[in-house]
Amino acid sequence: MKVLLIKDVKSLGKAGEIKEVKDGYGQNFLINKGLAKLATPDVVENWKAEQARQEKELKEEIERFEAEKKMLEAHTIRIEKQSAPVGIKGSVGNADISAAIKEQLDIDLDKKHINLKKALKSTGIHEVDAKLGHGIHATLKVEVVGV
C-alpha cells in the first residue's frame, strides 16, 4: 500500500514523501496514529495545494516583517517622561516602547520581542534591538525626552 506521510517518521521518511509499506503497518500504525494517509490522487493533490498555500503565507509574512523592519528603522520612536535633576523620573521599559510603536507607527510589536538589556533611565537617543519573527531583527532608535 502507498501512503503519504503527514509527519516525519523516524524509520520511514519525512513529511510529504510517498512510501510503499505493508498493508498492516500502514493501516494499523501509520494511518491509525495520524502519521500518514492513504496516497490516493486526491489526497496527494490536496497535500500539495496545502503546502503551496502555507509556503505562500510564509512568504507574505516574511515580506510584511521586512516592510515593518524598514519602517521601524526609518523612524525614531519618541517617548516623553517627566524629567528629574539627572535623567528622567522612572524608566522606559519594553512595554513603554511597544506602546509608543503602536501609537506612532501603528505596528503591533509584543513587548517580549523587544530586547532591552536594562530599562532606559536617561534622556537621549538609544538603540534597541527588536525581533520581528523568522529571524528578522530591527534596530530601533528610541528618543527619550524629559518634559
Swiss-Prot record:
InterPro entries: Ribosomal_bL9, Ribosomal_bL9/RNase_H1_N, Ribosomal_bL9_bac/chp, Ribosomal_bL9_C, Ribosomal_bL9_C_sf, Ribosomal_bL9_N, Ribosomal_bL9_N_sf. Keywords: Ribonucleoprotein, Ribosomal protein, RNA-binding, rRNA-binding. NCBIfam families: L9. GO terms for cellular component: ribonucleoprotein complex; ribosome. GO terms for molecular function: rRNA binding; structural constituent of ribosome. SUPFAM superfamilies: L9 N-domain-like, Ribosomal protein L9 C-domain. Binds to the 23S rRNA. This is Large ribosomal subunit protein bL9. GO terms for biological process: translation. Belongs to the bacterial ribosomal protein bL9 family. PANTHER family: 50S RIBOSOMAL PROTEIN L9.
